A protein has these predicted regions:
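A compositional/biophysical signature of low hydrophobicity enriched in polar/charged and small residues
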Residues: 1-189
């Protein structure tokens, strides 16, 4: 997609203030509001202007984990976490590690339990690097689903009952909010 200076200004103004009015943008780039609306529509259809609503884990006092790993089944790993309430996002990447995953929780021990119980224990995983994010330069927004329908089976596909897991019993893991087997406070009503 070719962007002109007005398109770049529109994108920048939305990046600086997602709630900015099209009227203000129109004044800044010297176009009518309907012309701005048409440009915004075109930019959105092309994927040049996206909106993401969610939570900022670090601002909320939650822990954010970055997990780099090497797996010979990266798509299966991504699929396993797709509906996990703790999963922020995942990326297929080049280099020694072929996946970069982000998770958030109110507990570092829960993040460690996810990594140890679902990633390190996975036979397709060859190497894992687990880190806690301390700060971000830009706001890191996660489109979190804090209210989801209860499910019988954990979204990660884990077999068994969280309540019987040693990490859960020792309060090292908060459990799975999706199944109701959860002992934390963040997802509680």
């Amino acid at each position: 997609m070719d962007l002109d200076d007005k398109d770049r200004t529109i994108i920048t103004m939305y990046a600086d203030d997602p709630d900015i009015s099209q009227e203000r943008i129109a004044q800044a780039i010297k176009l009518s509001q309907p012309s701005v609306a048409a440009r915004v529509s075109r930019l959105r259809k092309a994927g040049a202007l996206e909106k993401s609503v969610g939570i900022s884990p670090l601002k909320m006092g939650l822990y954010l984990a970055k997990v780099d790993l090497a797996s010979n089944e990266p798509d299966a790993i991504l699929h396993m976490f797709r509906s996990c309430p703790y999963f922020a996002n995942g990326f297929s990447v080049s280099g020694r590690h072929n996946l970069c995953l982000f998770f958030f929780s109110e507990s570092v021990a829960t993040l460690e339990s996810i990594v140890n119980g679902h990633i390190r224990s996975n036979p397709s995983v060859k190497e894992v690097d687990f880190n806690i994010v301390i700060t971000t330069e830009r706001d890191f927004v996660v489109p979190a689903r804090l209210r989801s329908e209860r499910v019988e089976e954990p979204p990660c596909g884990m077999k068994g009952d969280c309540r019987r897991c040693p990490s859960f019993l020792e309060k090292k893991c908060m459990g799975c909010p999706a199944t109701g087997q959860y002992q934390g406070s963040f997802y509680q009503p």
